């Protein structure tokens, strides 16, 4: 009785993932859901997607010749505050845990982009075209970045270590790989019921994770967090014993003829004559086989040899052939032939 509380609720019979040809954008559609569950699940997934998925981000930067973020650098058009804001937007994927170090060194004139950063093996820059700063003629800049992993948003103040050397500038860290999430609820039909919920999630990521995977991770987080509230064990439901009736014929007759080691000519002749299973084949007489177009004595002898190796021959009678559920039987007995 108590299991009906969750077993009889309608669940989505399909979840569609639409990528729009991009790794950074995805739409997830789930339907049908019980009334109210679209809002319940949509809101919960959105919050977890934005706050709880782990990612990588720059936590601090050290720029040669700069003591604090309110400085300016000769020959660099942006001041340090703007450079730090640009650094915050660098999208990073990192395998394993941090912290890791990355360095960029460049001479002007030109633009310094995220793609100029020299990364270590397990760190990847996902938006290499992102502009960090612009150098004039004769200008030079060298920056060293600290990269770490975490979740959510961590302000620069929390990235400031007490023993940090002078000139190490903390950066706001946007660890979450998910940039934007929106959802909408619409009515959908299931059978005669017209007002079930249809949940559509639109997700934008930084490319370190796909929208489909992000939703899967968020759902797993919710599943893990909610499991603590379940204070009972479900009674084990015994699977009904499937009654398998005794076959009235050799299971080998359920094997398809295209699995036999026949020549291409012989196999094509059987296919053209709509002979699918060995059970179809052995009921044919030699005379019937020879009337098959393009089927000659050589093909006949080949088939007779193959059947003989299985203890079978042409012209056999099988009263119960073909069974109504032949495809199901073929799958059930495929390990017996």
Swiss-Prot record:
<comment type="function">
    <text>DNA-dependent RNA polymerase catalyzes the transcription of DNA into RNA using the four ribonucleoside triphosphates as substrates.</text>
</comment>
<dbReference type="GO" id="GO:0005737">
    <property type="term" value="C:cytoplasm"/>
</dbReference>
<feature type="region of interest" description="Alpha C-terminal domain (alpha-CTD)">
    <location>
        <begin position="249"/>
        <end position="337"/>
    </location>
</feature>
<comment type="subunit">
    <text>Homodimer. The RNAP catalytic core consists of 2 alpha, 1 beta, 1 beta' and 1 omega subunit. When a sigma factor is associated with the core the holoenzyme is formed, which can initiate transcription.</text>
</comment>
<dbReference type="Pfam" id="PF01000">
    <property type="entry name" value="RNA_pol_A_bac"/>
</dbReference>
<dbReference type="InterPro" id="IPR036643">
    <property type="entry name" value="RNApol_insert_sf"/>
</dbReference>
<dbReference type="GO" id="GO:0046983">
    <property type="term" value="F:protein dimerization activity"/>
</dbReference>
<dbReference type="GO" id="GO:0003677">
    <property type="term" value="F:DNA binding"/>
</dbReference>
<dbReference type="InterPro" id="IPR011773">
    <property type="entry name" value="DNA-dir_RpoA"/>
</dbReference>
<dbReference type="GO" id="GO:0006351">
    <property type="term" value="P:DNA-templated transcription"/>
</dbReference>
<dbReference type="GO" id="GO:0000428">
    <property type="term" value="C:DNA-directed RNA polymerase complex"/>
</dbReference>
<dbReference type="InterPro" id="IPR011260">
    <property type="entry name" value="RNAP_asu_C"/>
</dbReference>
<keyword id="KW-0804">Transcription</keyword>
<dbReference type="InterPro" id="IPR011262">
    <property type="entry name" value="DNA-dir_RNA_pol_insert"/>
</dbReference>
<dbReference type="InterPro" id="IPR011263">
    <property type="entry name" value="DNA-dir_RNA_pol_RpoA/D/Rpb3"/>
</dbReference>
<dbReference type="GO" id="GO:0003899">
    <property type="term" value="F:DNA-directed RNA polymerase activity"/>
</dbReference>
<protein>
    <recommendedName>
        <fullName>DNA-directed RNA polymerase subunit alpha</fullName>
        <ecNumber>2.7.7.6</ecNumber>
    </recommendedName>
</protein>
<keyword id="KW-0548">Nucleotidyltransferase</keyword>
<dbReference type="Pfam" id="PF01193">
    <property type="entry name" value="RNA_pol_L"/>
</dbReference>
<dbReference type="Pfam" id="PF03118">
    <property type="entry name" value="RNA_pol_A_CTD"/>
</dbReference>
<feature type="region of interest" description="Alpha N-terminal domain (alpha-NTD)">
    <location>
        <begin position="1"/>
        <end position="233"/>
    </location>
</feature>
<keyword id="KW-0808">Transferase</keyword>
<dbReference type="InterPro" id="IPR036603">
    <property type="entry name" value="RBP11-like"/>
</dbReference>
<comment type="similarity">
    <text>Belongs to the RNA polymerase alpha chain family.</text>
</comment>
<keyword id="KW-0240">DNA-directed RNA polymerase</keyword>
């Amino acid at each position: 009785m108590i299991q009906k509380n969750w077993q009889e609720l309608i669940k989505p019979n399909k979840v569609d993932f639409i990528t729009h040809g991009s790794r950074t954008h995805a739409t997830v559609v789930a339907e049908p859901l019980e009334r109210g569950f679209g809002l319940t699940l949509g809101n919960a997934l959105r919050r977890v997607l934005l706050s709880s998925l782990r990612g990588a981000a720059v936590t601090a930067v050290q720029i040669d010749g700069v003591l604090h973020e309110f400085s300016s650098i000769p020959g660099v058009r942006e001041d340090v505050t703007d450079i730090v804001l640009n650094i915050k937007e660098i999208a990073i994927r990192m395998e394993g845990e941090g912290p890791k170090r990355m360095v960029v060194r460049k001479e002007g004139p030109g633009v310094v982009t995220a793609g100029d950063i020299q990364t270590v093996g397990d760190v990847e820059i996902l938006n290499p075209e992102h502009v960090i700063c612009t150098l004039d003629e004769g200008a030079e800049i060298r920056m060293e970045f600290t990269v770490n992993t975490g979740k959510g948003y961590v302000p620069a103040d929390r990235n400031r270590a007490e023993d940090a050397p002078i000139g190490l500038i903390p950066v706001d860290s946007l660890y979450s790989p998910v940039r934007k999430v929106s959802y909408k609820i619409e009515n959908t039909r299931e059978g005669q019921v017209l007002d079930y919920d249809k949940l559509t999630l639109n997700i934008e990521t930084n490319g370190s994770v796909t929208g489909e995977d992000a939703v899967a991770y968020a759902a797993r987080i919710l599943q893990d967090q909610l499991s603590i509230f379940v204070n009972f064990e479900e009674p084990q439901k015994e699977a009904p014993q499937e009654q398998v009736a005794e076959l009235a014929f050799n299971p080998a007759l359920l094997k398809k003829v295209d699995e036999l080691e026949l020549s291409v000519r012989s196999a094509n002749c059987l296919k053209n004559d709509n002979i699918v299973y060995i059970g179809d084949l052995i009921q044919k007489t030699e005379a019937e086989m020879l009337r098959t177009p393009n089927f000659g004595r050589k093909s006949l002898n080949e088939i007779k040899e193959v059947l003989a190796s299985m203890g079978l021959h042409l012209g056999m009678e099988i009263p119960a052939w073909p069974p109504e559920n032949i495809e199901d039987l073929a799958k059930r007995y495929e390990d017996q032939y």
